[in-house]
A protein has these predicted regions:
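Transmembrane alpha-helices and adjacent helix-loop boundaries
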Residues: 1-262
Length: 262
């Protein structure tokens, strides 16, 4: 039976390798989910309607029009039907209403069940790719709701002022809305980022060798050391240090953006 001093170097090296995988998944998710979340937020606020061109006509219908009230109601519903918004919000509802672990299993196994082949490839690279896509899609949906709240929280009068000045919609977003939105979303985004650090451990459900998987391997005896539970507890130190550093960095960013504070 090996002693603690003999086990420690082996465990430390394995946990470092697992933590690097955790870091990779964390940063890949952030890099992918933030821009995708912004795009999804635009979709959830979309005002496009396939029959929107009829809206001015309906507004100008004379009161003595031969259309019945029911026909007018049907027309109004048809004009106000916004398919992009409905589809995007339905997807967000599904993603937010189901566990991330279940989504990981669906992303990894469902394509193989339908296509009868493993589209992710074999080995750790395939599992990492599947995990990354599942995490990006999940967190993009959560981020999109934060972005939507930040955008809609900017007073409409400022956007209207930009239109009066002759600015395009793109110019209004980048020069008027974006900076104010960023300040509003930092606190809720900080919470989601810290949650992401811990959620990366869920990827072990498809055997991605992140840090928790590495710690469990020693308990199961698959790393040459059998029945050692202390490596699993030791993983908490990695999470605490990384979460602490992120909390400090995000706190400084929030203070820097808090320009209303005296």
């Amino acid at each position: 039976m090996t002693t603690f001093s003999e086990q420690f170097p082996i465990v430390f090296q394995a946990l470092n390798v697992g933590f690097l995988q955790t870091l990779k998944l964390f940063f890949v998710t952030l890099i992918g989910a933030i821009p995708l979340g912004l795009i999804i937020s635009f979709g959830s606020m979309s005002r496009w309607s396939p029959l929107g061109f009829l809206r001015p006509y309906l507004k100008n219908l004379p009161k003595d029009s031969k259309l019945t009230w029911w026909q007018k109601t049907q027309l109004w519903f048809a004009v106000d039907f916004r398919p992009i918004r409905l589809i995007v919000r339905f997807v967000i509802w599904v993603v937010r209403g189901t566990p991330l672990m279940l989504q990981l299993l669906v992303f990894y196994y469902f394509p193989g069940l339908v296509l009868h082949k493993n589209i992710w490839g074999s080995g750790e690279a395939g599992r990492f790719l599947a995990s990354s896509i599942a995490f990006i899609f999940n967190y993009a949906c959560y981020f999109s709701e934060i972005f939507r709240g930040g955008i809609q929280g900017v007073p409409k009068g400022q956007q209207e002022a930009g239109q009066v000045l002759g600015m395009t919609s793109t110019q209004i977003f980048f020069k008027v809305t974006l900076l104010q939105m960023v300040k509003r979303i930092v606190p809720p985004m900080s919470n989601e980022v810290i949650t992401l650090v811990k959620d990366t451990s869920l990827s072990r459900i498809i055997a991605l060798q992140e840090i928790i998987w590495a710690g469990q391997a020693f308990l199961k005896g698959t790393q040459g050391i059998s029945g050692a539970i202390w490596p699993l507890f030791f993983t908490g130190i990695y999470y605490l240090i990384f979460s602490g550093l992120l909390t400090l960095a995000l706190g400084k960013l929030e203070k820097k953006l808090d320009y209303f504070k005296a």
